Regions:
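Bacterial N-terminal signal peptides
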Residues: 4-15
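A conserved helix-loop-strand patch within extracytoplasmic ligand-binding domains
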Residues: 96-149
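Ligand-binding pocket segment of bilobal, Venus flytrap-like solute-binding proteins
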Residues: 73-77, 149-190
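Short, polar/charged alpha-helical segment
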Residues: 32-50
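Pocket-flanking alpha-helical
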Residues: 37, 55-94, 187-189
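Extracytoplasmic "Venus flytrap"
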Residues: 22-38, 59
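Boundary at the C-terminal end of the N-terminal hydrophobic targeting segment
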Residues: 18-20
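Short helix-initiation/N-cap motifs at beta->coil->alpha
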Residues: 30-31, 51-65, 171, 175-187
């Protein structure tokens, strides 16, 4: 379904004076960030001979630790812009955060299973607002189709909430659900 192009940037606040140093990499907990954090840790340990530690936390905690510059967390593995622009607008000018000069592009979108898409002829996000689709997405019997928009604290959840409104899905009976990714995954498997 329709995706939004978002630029993801890696914070490069790693300053090795020697390759044997320990780098603390924040892990904000979404699957893409966790994968990138693990890849960065592998590069630090396997290619640079250093040590790496993954430190879990939400964006506020990770950026706060980077800003304090006390070695609590030195790297944010997956900065999504414009979702996290408030953090970068604050920390980059202060010099406590440096963004990669070689950013990569990430795509953010919405998905349904192929089986669901085929059964209900879903080809665009607006199709989720059709009455038969809303009914099929209503797992708790309240008459509204649940739509996972992200976890509490994720800037993307706020963006997704606005997008659902702008697509007219609230008026069509779609209910935005904020929950941890693991909770969402468990619900999908039910």
């Amino acid at each position: 379904i329709k995706s939004t192009l978002v630029a993801g940037l890696i914070s490069l606040f790693i300053s090795f004076s020697s390759y044997a140093e320990k780098v603390k990499i924040g892990d904000p907990g979404w699957t893409g960030a966790t994968a990138i954090a693990n890849l960065l840790a592998a590069v630090v340990t396997d290619k640079m001979g250093g040590e790496a530690e993954l430190v879990p936390g939400n964006n506020t905690a990770i950026y706060g630790a980077i800003d304090r510059s006390k070695g609590e967390i030195e790297v944010h593995p997956d900065i999504w812009l414009p979702n996290q622009q408030a953090y970068t607008n604050d920390l980059v000018p202060k010099g406590t955060l440096k963004l990669s000069s070689k950013p990569y592009e990430g795509n953010q979108g919405y998905c349904v299973s192929q089986q669901f898409a085929k059964k209900f002829n879903i080809t665009a996000i607006e199709d989720l607002g059709r009455p038969e689709v809303v009914k099929a997405m209503d797992s708790d019997g309240n008459g509204k189709g649940e739509f996972w928009i992200g976890a509490d604290g994720w800037a993307s959840a706020n963006v997704n909430q606005v997008k659902l409104r702008d697509y007219g899905l609230y008026d069509a009976g779609i209910e935005p659900i904020r929950a941890a990714e693991a909770v969402k995954n468990a619900r999908v498997l039910d």
